[in-house]
Amino acid sequence: MADRVKGPWSQEEDEQLRRMVEKYGPRNWSAISKSIPGRSGKSCRLRWCNQLSPEVEHRPFSPEEDETIVTARAQFGNKWATIARLLNGRTDNAVKNHWNSTLKRKCSGGVAVTTVTETEEDQDRPKKRRSVSFDSAFAPVDTGLYMSPESPNGIDVSDSSTIPSPSSPVAQLFKPMPISGGFTVVPQPLPVEMSSSSEDPPTSLSLSLPGAENTSSSHNNNNNALMFPRFESQMKINVEERGEGRRGEFMTVVQEMIKAEVRSYMAEMQKTSGGFVVGGLYESGGNGGFRDCGVITPKVE
């Protein structure tokens, strides 16, 4: 098999192709290609149909033909055989070559110009929007404060409404203004002072001697509350439960409770601080206790 020849056809090849077409007709391209070394049947067919056939129009395409090709291509796409049937004497290959070499460039050029124009306009719009947004984002905000240009550390701040002119003799004066933050100080509620009368038990008890001054009553009440917390709370409960009708029985119980608490307290005081009792009588024995109230005083060393 001879090597395939690529490139333009020579005059000798064209003459040989015409003779073979007259001999075999414009159909048997395989037999025709055997008489032309290096050319395939397809190459012979294209050369004949596009260039050498007497039916092919070699005149330039008219503007009417160009308009027909452009309209048909917009409708049919790249179906060149279908488009060529709309033109007398034009082959599909001729129409395709004319489109690729001339019409496509013209149409794409016009479209390209329009597209570029629109694209430039579209590109300008975002740029304008970006520039506006950039300017607005970084525009100086009037905060009502004025920074001193002559301050070494730039900390001096003053009200912009009182900015002195550079030529003013008071241009060196700056009034620092505090900047209020986003914090709200909630005042603490004042403690509610409860009267001692609402917390005192219905029955007032005291360890002081009869005839003692009333000035030490509040102090004694506080000491009693500290010394006998269990007794005080339990006494309140008993008063509420028993009522006024059984007051006599309740007082007996209260006296027994007081004796027990005093004994416990005195025993603890003797162990810790070495205190002693003055003004009271103590009964010894299994049922011993304090018959009368006395004053507890610390031992003086």
From Swiss-Prot:
Where is this gene product found? Nucleus
Instruction: List the stretches of this chain annotated as a DNA-binding region.
Output: 29-52, 80-103
User: What range does the record give for the signal peptide?
Assistant: none
**Gene Ontology BP terms:** lateral root development; positive regulation of auxin mediated signaling pathway; regulation of DNA-templated transcription
**Compositionally biased tracts (Low complexity):** 155-167, 195-224
Inducers of expression:
Induced by auxin. Down-regulated by potassium deprivation.
Q: Which UniProt keywords apply?
A: DNA-binding, Nucleus, Repeat, Transcription, Transcription regulation
What GO molecular function annotations does the UniProt record carry, in alphabetical order?
A: DNA-binding transcription factor activity; transcription cis-regulatory region binding
Expression across tissues is:
Expressed in roots, stems and flowers. Expressed in dry seeds. Expressed in root vasculature, root tips and lateral root.
Instruction: Give me the ranges of the annotated region Disordered.
Output: 145-167, 190-225
Which SUPFAM superfamilies does this one have? Answer: Homeodomain-like
Q: What happens when the gene is disrupted?
A: No visible phenotype under normal growth conditions.
The miscellaneous remark of the record is: Plants overexpressing MYB77 exhibit stunted roots and shoots.
The protein's role, per its UniProt record: Transcription factor involved in auxin response. Functions in auxin signal transduction and modulates lateral root growth. Interacts with ARF response factors to promote auxin-responsive gene expression. In response to auxin, binds sequence-specific motifs in the promoter of the auxin-responsive gene IAA19, and activates IAA19 transcription. The IAA19 transcription activation by MYB77 is enhanced by direct interaction between MYB77 and PYL8.
Protein name per UniProt:
Transcription factor MYB77
| Protein's gene | MYB77
